Amino acid sequence: MIIFPAVDIQNGKAVRLKQGRAHESTVFAESPVDAARAWEEAGARWLHVVDLDGAFDGAAQSRRIVRDICAALAIPVQLGGGIRDMHTAEAYLEAGVSRLIIGTLALEQPTLFADMCRAFPGRVGVSLDAEGGRLKSRGWVEDTGMTVDTALPRLLDDGAAFVIYTDIERDGMQCGVNVAALEHLARLSTVPVIAAGGVATLEDIQKLYPLTLETSLMGAVSGRALYEGTLDLKEANAWIDARKNTPESA
């Protein structure tokens, strides 16, 4: 199981939102690069970066910052937010991003998403962001009318290499994870699934861990909880590592 610390970029700073609302942001670091370095030093094995300006505006806004983050780290980076054409996808991969997270484009332009998956095999995943069971797009402000059950089969057929599932109502609220929804998705999916939204404490990691042994769940993104200290990255990684060689993990 991998824990992905989140660095969300808005107006050049590292922030966290509540339930994806752009006007409810908390600045946690003036420099996203410094925040990224701090998570690597704390033991992060992957970094999860989101260009929030790109997600809301529909165009890549933070390419220079993302490039600087990738150059500063030895660990791989996955990136989402504002990737809505092939040129932007290619530019971010050339900048050092290991894999891309596609949301709006995957739901609204299936042919282009499939082309992107073919062009960059194994490096393009999909973000499924749900509120009340329905998937949202365009920075979580538009209701697509789709659900996980209706959207996932086509996205897998298109070539999605992994899935990130965000429970919007729990994102940034530190209220715990929606284990039932995650388990449902992780049993449907044939590619790795990453949980996001509400991962707030070591107890949440402990609730999710059994699913990594039984389903396609492979990790969890956490942001505000790591910044505010309700989840300690070193402690969580140590807890996971202690179970790698136990009988239940064999």
From Swiss-Prot:
SUPFAM superfamilies: Ribulose-phoshate binding barrel (SSF51366). GO terms for molecular function: 1-(5-phosphoribosyl)-5-[(5-phosphoribosylamino)methylideneamino]imidazole-4-carboxamide isomerase activity. It comes from the Bacteria. It catalyses: 1-(5-phospho-beta-D-ribosyl)-5-[(5-phospho-beta-D-ribosylamino)methylideneamino]imidazole-4-carboxamide = 5-[(5-phospho-1-deoxy-D-ribulos-1-ylimino)methylamino]-1-(5-phospho-beta-D-ribosyl)imidazole-4-carboxamide. Pathway: Amino-acid biosynthesis; L-histidine biosynthesis; L-histidine from 5-phospho-alpha-D-ribose 1-diphosphate: step 4/9. Keywords: Amino-acid biosynthesis, Cytoplasm, Histidine biosynthesis, Isomerase. Its main location: cytoplasm. One of its GO terms (biological process) is L-histidine biosynthetic process. One of its GO terms (cellular component) is cytoplasm. Its EC number is 5.3.1.16. The active site is at D8 (proton acceptor), D129 (proton donor). It is found in: Cytoplasm. The keyword Transmembrane helix does not apply. It holds the Pfam family His_biosynth. HAMAP family: HisA. NCBIfam families: 1-(5-phosphoribosyl)-5-[(5-phosphoribosylamino)methylideneamino]imidazole-4-carboxamide isomerase. This is 1-(5-phosphoribosyl)-5-[(5-phosphoribosylamino)methylideneamino] imidazole-4-carboxamide isomerase. It comes from Desulfovibrio desulfuricans (strain ATCC 27774 / DSM 6949 / MB).
